Design a protein with these regions (language model features):
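RNase H-like two-metal-ion nuclease catalytic core shared by retroviral integrases
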Residues: 67-69, 75-76, 89-111, 126-129, ...
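Generic alpha-helical structural context detector
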Residues: 52, 80, 104-108, 112, ...
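Hydrophobic (often cysteine-bearing) scaffold residues that line and stabilize catalytic clefts
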Residues: 1, 22, 43, 47, ...
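Short, acidic, Ser/Thr-enriched surface-loop or helix-capping motifs
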Residues: 27-28
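Mobile-element integrase/transposase regions
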Residues: 1-24, 48-49, 60-62
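C-terminal domain-tail junction helix/linker
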Residues: 83-87, 111-158
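Active-site beta-loop-alpha junctions of metal-dependent nucleic acid enzymes
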Residues: 18, 36-58
C-alpha cells in the first residue's frame, strides 16, 4: 500500500429513525476496500476500529492515508495511531471534496448501485448493514473495473 483514502458516509432509511454510518479505507493501488466499520454513530471509536482492522499487517509502512477534514481525522488519537504505525496523514483542503475523489467515487458507486431507489426495501438497519457488507464483498471480489484492465480489485493486486 502506498496511498489509501478514508471518509465516513451516512445512510438513512424510512424504516428507522436511526442512521447507519460507513467508515472504509480504500487502497489507492487497486480501489479495494481493505477495511471498514459500520456504526449508528459517526464517532471516534468507529474510526479507531476501522484503522485497527486496516493496519494490522506489516504492509503499511510509508503509507499515506488521505481523508477530508472531518473532526475524526483532526483528533489527536487519530494522528497518534497513524504515527505509531509509520503512516502519514494527508487531508483535503477545507470544503474541497474532489481532493478525496477516490473515496467519494466509491461512495457514489456504492449508493447508486445498491442504495438509491432501494431505501424503502430495507426494513431495518440490520438488513441495510448486511446489504452494505454484501456489496463491499461484491465490489472487492466480483465487480470488474476498466481502470484495472478488466480485473476485480483483489485479482489486480496479485
Amino acid at each position: 500500500m502506498e496511498k489509501c483514502y478514508t471518509d465516513v458516509t451516512e445512510f438513512a432509511i424510512p424504516a428507522s429513525t436511526q442512521k447507519l454510518y460507513l467508515s472504509p479505507v480504500l487502497d489507492g493501488f487497486n480501489s479495494e476496500i481493505i477495511a471498514y466499520n459500520l456504526s449508528t454513530s459517526p464517532n471516534l471509536e468507529q474510526v479507531k476500529s476501522m484503522l485497527e482492522q486496516a493496519f494490522t499487517e506489516k504492509h503499511y509502512e510509508n503509507t499515506i492515508l488521505h481523508s477530508d477534514q472531518g473532526w475524526q481525522y483532526r483528533h489527536d488519537s487519530y494522528h497518534r495511531f497513524l504515527e505509531s504505525k509509520g503512516i502519514q496523514a494527508s487531508m483535503s483542503r477545507k470544503g474541497n471534496s474532489p481532493d478525496n475523489g477516490m473515496m467519494e467515487s466509491f461512495f457514489g458507486i456504492l449508493k447508486s448501485e445498491m442504495f438509491y431507489g432501494f431505501e424503502k426495501s430495507f426494513q431495518s438497519l440490520k438488513q441495510l448493514e448486511q446489504a452494505i457488507i454484501d456489496y463491499i464483498d461484491y465490489y472487492n471480489n466480483k465487480r470488474i473495473k476498466v481502470k484495472l484492465k478488466g480485473l476485480i480489485p483483489v485479482q489486480y493486486r496479485t
